[in-house]
Amino acid sequence: MKKKPIYLWVLLILSALLSAISLFGLISPVPTAESMGNIESSGVDATYAKELIAYTIKVTEHAHSIFNMILVVLSAILVVVALVFLVRKNIQLANYTYIGYVFLAILGSIYNFIGVQDAVSLFTDPNIRMGAELGAKGSAIFGIVLNVIFLAIVFYKMWRQQKELTEAQEEEELA
């Protein structure tokens, strides 16, 4: 009896959730200084509030760039296509499509890290800048490591499937 690719279902469901969150981020509007004016009135230091507003706007504009939109839409399409292949029990094509998604997700993590680094320079306080840089680096590293782990799982399972197929063919030849 052939094993079910539970690993791929789990990975694709997690990736579909992440893609849905990214698509929602594209739909949300870019904030303006006026819409974020309540930060200044919340008792926060005025300089920090202005820098935080500028940082938030810059990061959101970067997230709404054409390149990022293409990355997000392509990743969502790849997840849907991989799910369709999986439902149709074409595991090999689902694996290859998912590998394409993972490489695209790694590219997206790097692109977002570069965009945040540009926005971090808006903070004048070195402690705040360092905190924002650490958050950006941590987020990028987490995203890349997570995707590399997903990639390793898929490659390992593909290798095992190929090994089992080869062993089954050898047994047929001997019989």
Residues covered by each model-derived region:
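Transmembrane alpha-helical segments in integral membrane proteins
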Residues: 66-89, 146-164
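Long amphipathic alpha-helices with heptad-repeat character
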Residues: 17-33, 55-70, 100, 107, ...
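Cytosolic juxtamembrane helix and N-cap/initiation of the first transmembrane helix
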Residues: 1-36, 153-166, 173-175
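Membrane-water interface of alpha-helical transmembrane segments
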Residues: 1-12, 58-69, 88-98, 130-140, ...
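Alpha-helical transmembrane segments
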Residues: 17-24, 77-81, 104-110, 149-156
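Loop-to-transmembrane helix junctions at the membrane interface
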Residues: 78-112
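Interfacial non-cytosolic loop connecting adjacent transmembrane helices
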Residues: 33-65, 111-141
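Alpha-helical transmembrane segments of multi-pass integral membrane proteins
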Residues: 106-175
